[in-house]
Amino acid sequence: MKYSISEIFINTSNKLDLDLFVYGFLQKDFIYSNYKKNSQNSKYKTNFKLSKKFLSLINSINFLKELVTEPSNIIYPTSFAKRTQSQINKKAVNLVTHDEKRIKKIGLNCLLAVNQGSKRDPIVMEFSKKNSKKNVDILFVGKGVCFDSGGISIKPSGGMEDMKWDMAGAAVTVSIIK
């Protein structure tokens, strides 16, 4: 049996409850439609503002979903780095992108060995917080092996369809920093 809901009234004085409720609706309603001619947008209409914290959370999660949904001819090391640069808050975060020459210099030889099987150059992204007055020791590391950045011939055929997700660790890291 299907139900149709035209309006929802929420009686709460707690903004957090409202934010969590709307957050659930917006996450459920995510549709990646970049390549659809007739994209379906959300049918929900709201007459309130989501807090900045939850709006930022939703935007970060949707960015993560977009990154892992894109096909491998769209997301590869260089395009991943460019898309990341366009999304981060440049006032709060420094982003340094290391190319193959720099990767060799700092000795990331395993990355270079895997990358020999690819026609695309490797990229390593390094983030740091700008103007931080606190000395906080937090490190996020996310593996971002994009499909066709090497190693395809050493993967068993049974795992090939999941190779696209090998970059999800880096996508999560970027989304946290975003």
What are these regions (language model features)?
Residues M1-D137, V141-G144:
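Short amphipathic alpha-helical segment within the helicase RecA-like ATPase core
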